[in-house]
Swiss-Prot record:
Protein name: Dihydroxy-acid dehydratase
GO terms (BP aspect): isoleucine biosynthetic process; L-valine biosynthetic process
Residues with PTM N6-carboxylysine: K125
Organism name: Janthinobacterium sp. (strain Marseille) (Minibacterium massiliensis)
Record carries keyword Metal-binding: yes
Length: 557
């Protein structure tokens, strides 16, 4: 049986002789035209440590595809460093890069009639961008995560990149010495790999393992370790088998599979960005999934992993404790996973977990049994109210002050808010309102890690509320609410909040409310005018014109 189901369209027949001439120029032989053409979407880049260790994974995948009877076709995908662009205009390109990556992969795979694709990525938006493309093209596919960074260390304390962001606030508040500030800066990132807590990259990689389109254990391996190369090779072998069996992403990514992925996100205390990205992934898979489904899942899935940013441990600790397979086995035995879902290996979830012990090892403290869950319900809550009738996202577990009502401190951009924080003009009890930062208004929903980390560093992380129509980094924690929809730019109520207004965030009631009389709101709405777009050309302008509401995943098509 021939497995070049798609590529035969450009390699077979008399009329394709010129095509074969071009392949011969790249070292192909006649017998290669009967083999499947397998894309390798290589996200290697020296822009960021998240992607700087990917080439070795691409190299072994290329070799393994060839040794397994395929023709590897390598092409590059771009990346943005969320950490480096944070707090600058560059952060506006972060979410947009999700769409750009998806478009790049879709264009190469479909333009060249590839029979399958192996996607390699590292930084945050590489994951959803690659997955969206895999689902759009619906050719046999597998995701290879570049791996997590190892924890840094300073004076015996483990560090992540968030340690460096929080140090900015501590240092400027006079709560940290120059020696410690410099020491954290120099030692926070000791290797290649993505940011080490259960931040966005590790959240998405873990969810892909649960979804069934990445290999078991692959999502928590560290990039520098040899097992990461071995996993990339095995991924290539598994992909060739999937091509032979015509096992495609949409055969795997069903509504039940997405429930499995979201269950793991809740159980591990994952990033708020997962809400946005899984809305987009479901859209690409043509699976019915809404923002309210996250709240449904939150109510039944406990948090069983003690992971940063709000917990103690990092992804490498999770790996040593048994990784995502151990988390999934605990959830499966509790009736919180669908064991009959298919995975890219050809096994069901239940079959893949059959050899995993039901109870986590006693010599680790990262993964808890259900009876000893850290929190009885999940952490990613969907809040609604007059400020966000479509829904917005907050992490609500572990909050010392789950309810706050305070005066609004209103900022129409991130920079003025950051200036106010650094000048010590924000005090306990305030509610920061950062707006015109949504999909269309930002544009691109920039992340607010710099201001939230500065507040934490100043000791205000538990006593100040923050709401925005932008996003938060996976490293953010505290009384913060993002993805407020509808956004200010399209007339959402967040755009009508005035300095000093009373605003309530209530994690118990899942409420976000502007405490202003309806008559006053109506008066303000009558006087509101949509501002001019911040960009009128280029990719930012394109995204602003096409992006849907954050409550729909900020998808562009």
């Amino acid at each position: 049986m021939a497995f070049n189901r798609r590529s035969k369209n450009i390699t077979q027949g008399i009329s394709r002789s010129p095509n074969r001439s071009m392949y011969y120029a790249m070292g192909y032989e006649k017998e290669d035209f009967d083999k499947p053409m397998v894309g390798v979407a290589n996200g290697h880049s020296t822009i960021t440590p998240c992607n700087s260790g990917l080439q070795k994974l691409a190299d072994i995948a290329i070799k393994t595809i060839k040794d397994s009877g395929g023709n590897p076709q390598v092409f590059g995908t771009p990346t943005i460093s969320d950490g480096m662009s944070m707090g600058t205009e560059g952060m506006k390109y972060s979410l947009i890069s999700r769409e750009v990556i998806a478009d790049c992969i879709e264009t190469a795979v479909n333009g060249q009639w590839m029979d399958g694709v192996l996607v390699i990525g590292g930084c945050d938006k590489n994951m959803p961008g690659g997955m969206i493309a895999m689902l759009r093209t619906n050719v046999p596919s597998i995701y290879v995560y570049g791996g997590t960074i190892k924890p840094g260390n300073w004076k015996g304390k483990d560090l992540t990149i968030v340690s460096a962001f929080e140090a900015v606030g501590e240092f400027t508040a006079g709560r940290m010495s120059q020696e410690d500030f410099d020491g954290i800066e120099r030692n926070a990132c000791p290797s290649a790999g993505s940011c080490g807590g259960m931040y966005t990259a590790n959240t998405m990689s873990s969810s892909f393992e649960a979804l069934g389109l990445a290999l078991p254990y692959s999502s928590t391996m560290a990039n520098p370790d040899d097992e990461k190369v071995g996993s990339a090779a095995e991924s290539a072998r598994v992909l060739i088998e999937a091509i032979k069996n015509d096992l495609k992403p949409r055969d795997i990514v069903t509504r039940k599979a997405i429930e499995n992925a979201v269950a793991v996100i809740m159980a591990t205390g994952g990033s708020t960005n997962a809400v946005l990205h899984f809305l987009a992934i479901a859209h690409a898979a043509e699976v019915e999934w809404t923002i309210d489904d996250f709240e449904r899942m939150r109510k039944k899935v406990p948090v069983i992993c003690d992971l940063k940013p709000s917990g103690k441990y990092v992804a490498t600790d999770l790996h040593k404790a048994g990784g995502i397979p151990q988390v999934m086995k605990v959830l499966l035995d509790a009736g919180l996973l669908h064991g009959d879902c298919m995975t890219i290996t050809g096994q069901t979830v239940a079959e893949a977990l059959a050899h995993i012990p039901s109870v986590p090892r006693a010599d680790q403290h990262v993964i808890h049994p259900i009876k000893d869950a850290l929190y009885e319900q999940g952490h990613l809550a969907i809040l609604k109210g007059n400020l966000s009738p479509e829904g917005c996202v907050a992490k609500i577990t572990g909050l010392k002050n789950p309810v706050i009502t305070g005066p609004a401190r209103v900022f129409d951009d991130e920079y003025s808010a950051m200036d106010a924080i650094m000048a010590n003009k924000i005090v306990a009890g305030d509610v920061l309102v950062m707006r015109y930062l949504g999909p269309k208004g930002g544009p691109g929903m920039p992340e607010m890690l710099a201001p939230t980390s500065a507040l934490v560093g100043q000791g205000l992380g538990e006593s100040v509320g923050l709401i925005t129509d932008g996003r938060f980094s996976g490293g953010t924690w505290g009384m913060v609410v993002g993805h407020v929809s509808p956004e200010a730019f399209v007339g959402g109520l967040i755009g009508l909040v005035e300095e000093g207004d009373s605003v309530t965030i209530d994690a118990h009631k899942l409420l976000i409310q502007l405490n202003v009389p309806e008559e006053e709101i109506a008066r303000r709405r009558a006087n509101w005018k949509q501002p001019a777009p911040r960009y009128t050309r280029g990719v930012l302008s394109k995204f602003a014109a096409l992006a849907s509401s954050a409550s729909k995943g900020a998808v562009t098509g």
